[in-house]
């Protein structure tokens, strides 16, 4: 089943669902989807153990980030599927951060995320630390894997 077919089969839709691919996902496929009542972002992607990507961690982090007030709400999840509220916006550019007011807001948001999200994490919280992933790749190569 393709990512789009998985999206269309979700039990959350009312009426016709329309989906538009959303760029960015390296290890998942993302869509902006809407039905007669809501507009959401749908992420479709399975665990990739060799890269230490485990979607239950993403779910836990997303729920904690919402509880901390820095991320949209998780509306639905199933193995390989995450559905969150859609927030209208745009990606900021380097030029945007020349505005000291906007830069200050961004710094405050990142600080708040680092300070508040850990207070809302529940259950097992494994890390995804790029330096550890690279070390693990190197060890795998050294052992002939």
Predicted segments with their positions:
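ATP-binding pocket architecture of kinase catalytic cores
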Residues: 21-129, 133-143
